[in-house]
Amino acid sequence: MSQIHKHPIPAAIAEHALITPEKYQHYYQQSVQNPDEFWGEQGKIIDWIKPYKTVKNTSFDPGHVSIRWFEDGTLNLAANCLDRHLAERGDQTAIIWEGDDPNQSKTVTYKQLHHDVCQFANVLKSLGVKKGDVVAIYMPMVPEAAVAMLACARIGAVHSVIFGGFSPDAVAGRIIDSHSKLVITADEGIRAGRAIPLKKNVDEALKNPAITSIKNVVVFQRTGNASYWEDGRDVWWHDLIKEASADCPPEEMNAEDPLFILYTSGSTGKPKGVVHTTGGYLVYAALTFKYVFDYHPGDIYWCTADVGWVTGHSYLLYGPLACGAITLMFEGVPNYPGVNRLSQVVDKHKVNILYTAPTAIRALMAEGDKAIEGTKRDSLRIMGSVGEPINPEAWEWYYNKIGNSKCPIVDTWWQTETGGFMITPLPGATELKAGSATRPFFGVQPALVDNLGNPQEGVAEGNLVITDSWPGQARTLFGDHERFEQTYFSTFKGMYFSGDGARRDEDGYYWITGRVDDVLNVSGHRLGTAEIESALVAHPKIAEAAVVGVPHNIKGQAIYAYITLNHGEEPTPELYTEVRNWVRKEIGPLATPDILHWTDSLPKTRSGKIMRRILRKIATGDTSNLGDTSTLADPSVVEKLLEEKQSMQTPS
């Protein structure tokens, strides 16, 4: 294929890199051959109150799945992210906050953050929150969201952060499932110039009669627009901290005490409350952050993720703060008020490391050079991609345009359930190939298996499994260990099943091919939708594409492609033929789309993932039950797609 673009390690990166190719080989071998020795040493990246003696105690055996790391050690996460830095870098910036409005920004030092966290931890105690209680956090992207999370960790409460874009029903469901005792929210959030009615959504959610555990709602004042107020239940953040002491000793926590619950949608049923514990998670978040981003003291790091997603937990807050880093928190979106906003923020704050998602990259790519207009971006040293496989064209555009053809891209594959990076390049140790997540991180043992669980050696394609545990691994699903075993360990016995497919090339590099339910079987041949989408998006007139399979009476499945064109382009019969021939040329006749569906927008969740389940149903005409659409950023897109489908004259 024309899309395999190799990029060597730049000399400027190699010179100062924390991990070289030789070090990677050495550490990786040690980490899989002697995990106790390797992780016993690496566990020291954080401070322990009582040091651990036992490192790894894990089992993936059917019916006995149990994951424990550093289980006899004790620590406090907030002390690791704050207190231990005060002597050396108390006056250093911990968080740079950039508002939705380009004229609003501020910095918070480690000393200030420590003070605010201690105060708010005492507020939580005064409201009756105890060690082990669950606190729901439904906040905008403001430093107070970090304060709330760290304050929970300081006193041993378990936080359940709910993304600010979720509906009242979704909020209610998460509060009920987790038995949350308290809700922390804001009057409103601000995103792309629009107000998000957070408090109103909480009020609506709390009308659910099944919610009996909530005593108080703490409200942070972001805009000053809180309409409804329930005396006795609702309390202002600013009123509470006025009275609060800034002296709050950190609670001593066992390594296996729960740190947070984070809900993630399953392919079936209600969202799953993924549980991460304190010790192994923090060791893994800190170690992966340090080495994957090749973090050097003083680097300014920007992860564009919201705190409501696992990326926001591990790589906006906990990983960076545990390492004493400077982390940038952005309230806005990459293309507001202008399409060059992301580039402007990079220049304004002299960002050295940028971590964002393919969805954002593709949206900017559709704007062409306008996305970098009037900016230099010459402070950038490392860039990263997260959330879904990045197609080689978007990778190259990101590399050449945003990164001025000099920044290695760490294309990271991982999941809510893995806690941290699993397969990823290391800037000073890995030659890059556009579109490949490359190699496993230390201690991660991936394998490819066929549908019967037989290992596929060498160059192969198959289901991506992990054969042994790692410290950042989720321990269970909240209140449902049976579902945890069923979801992740029953498909392939004795292995963690990721739900993703991958192929391994001749260099041992992994290429994620998409969810396994996004695999097409055309005339007995397996085709990953990501591969076809990649070819489509490589066409100069196409901005975005999503591919699904529809039943075909001869081939088994036909290929149905939803396509969004770049601004200014119009669909024509000529373009229809041209696009089909283009894919035929890029991948081969088998991959030629049978049906093209032109559309202005695709149904996406608020985190930017394309909702393929809905696209499959629309494509097959099965619209009787589209399932839960509450997580869609814009539900009206579905109606539009249905209308388009009805009016389509598809060539047979």
Curated annotation (Swiss-Prot):
UniProt cross-references to InterPro entries, sorted A to Z: Ac_CoA_lig (IPR011904), ACAS_N (IPR032387), AMP-bd_C (IPR025110), AMP-bd_C_sf (IPR045851), AMP-binding_CS (IPR020845), AMP-dep_synth/lig_dom (IPR000873), ANL_N_sf (IPR042099)
Biological processes, Gene Ontology terms: acetyl-CoA biosynthetic process; acetyl-CoA biosynthetic process from acetate; chemotaxis
Annotated binding of CoA, by residue: R191, A192, G193, R194, T311, N335, S523, R584
Cofactor(s) listed in the protein's UniProt record: Mg(2+)
Chain positions with N6-acetyllysine modification: K609
Pfam families per UniProt: ACAS_N (PF16177), AMP-binding (PF00501), AMP-binding_C (PF13193)
Binding positions (Mg(2+)): V537, H539, I542
Official protein name in the record: Acetyl-coenzyme A synthetase
Source organism of the structure: Yersinia pestis
Lineage: Bacteria, Pseudomonadati, Pseudomonadota, Gammaproteobacteria, Enterobacterales
